[in-house]
Structures are given as structure tokens and as C-alpha cells.
Amino acid sequence: MDVSSDGNIFLAGHTLSGTQNWDTYTIKLNSNGDLIWEQKVGNPRGFNPQYIHDEAWGIKATNDGGCVTIAGTGDEYNYSQCNGNDCSDTWNAYLIKFDNIGNIDFETTFSSLDLYNYAYDWAGEDIDLTDDGGAVIAIDNGQFGFLKIDGIQTNLIGDINFDSMIDILDVVILVNVVLGLEQNNVSDINQDNMVNILDIVQLINIILNFDI
């Protein structure tokens, strides 16, 4: 589970409801618990979906109003199918990026074949976002490891309303935060663990290209 800066709730898991086998199940709720959207997604490598388990274990809200879900994908049956060196019974970490309204921005898999000349099982167990717009994924590979990736979200310091722009609307929100009229957890522009007039000054300088 994760909660976005504007109070929306994101949940991830896996389900057999309305699917051919276990598929990832991602839900976005508003702060009252009302459903905004839900998505069931699986079988990214295109094998027979009747034999593929897609099991989601982690999720993070992204600054565009969407989220990123991390899972594992593979089969646990006598069935086995291969596309080149990529075989269904070798599990992969499975990442899905959703936008604000639940559409898939992109999905991809990661495996030991990306790094080595031999295959063994990988599954994504959890995910956290990094300040450079990427993410760190916790990998179950029979032991435990971490995978650093890029390109999960655009990191715009000062984009307080998450509209992919830095403008006067962000200044208005920041002023309201300083006055105690609103709450926002990305308002500390200068990263001094306080939100005050200095953050407003720096945000205005960013807009005027005096500070980058």
C-alpha cells in the first residue's frame, strides 16, 4: 500500500477473480476509500496465461497521480514454453507503471539473463522511488538483492501540484501551505526540513530561472 501526497490510496496484490490465473491487481482509492480505478494485468511475456502466475508485492505512488507496481511472473506447473532463452518456468521481476487514470504507461520484466549468461528465478518483492526519478527494487533471487532502475517519473522540484509544470499555481499552493491553509509533503523546496518564506522565494527564483 502507498498513499500519494494528495491523499489517494494505492493497493497492490494478485487475484483469481475474472482472470485465467493469478494476475496482478492494482487499485486506486480516494481518501474516503471510494474506488477511482482498478486494473488486473499479467502475462507480460506472452506465454499461455492459464499457467502463468503474476504476483504483486509492492507499490509506490508516483508524482503524476499514477503508481508503479512490482511483481513476479512465471509458472509453477509442468507446462514450460520458451521464447529463445526466456522460459516461462524461469521467473522474472515484473514492473507496471500506471498513469493517473489507470492506463498502463509501460510494463517490463527483469531477469538474471539481463546481467548473466544463465537463468535463475527473480521476483520483485518491493519498490521504492529515488530522488533522481528512478527506483530501487527488492529482488527475491533465492537469496536477496536490489535492482536500481531509471525513468519511473519526472522529478521536478517545485511542481507541487504534479501537473508537470512549475508556475504560479505552485506558488499559490506553497503560500497556502506556509499559511497553514493546505498540507503538501513536497513543499520543502530548499530541503531544510521546514516550509516557510524561504521556500516561496526559492520557488519564485526557479520559475524566473534564477535558481535551478
Language-model segments: residues:
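Cellulosome-associated attachment modules in secreted, modular CAZymes
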Residues: 151-212
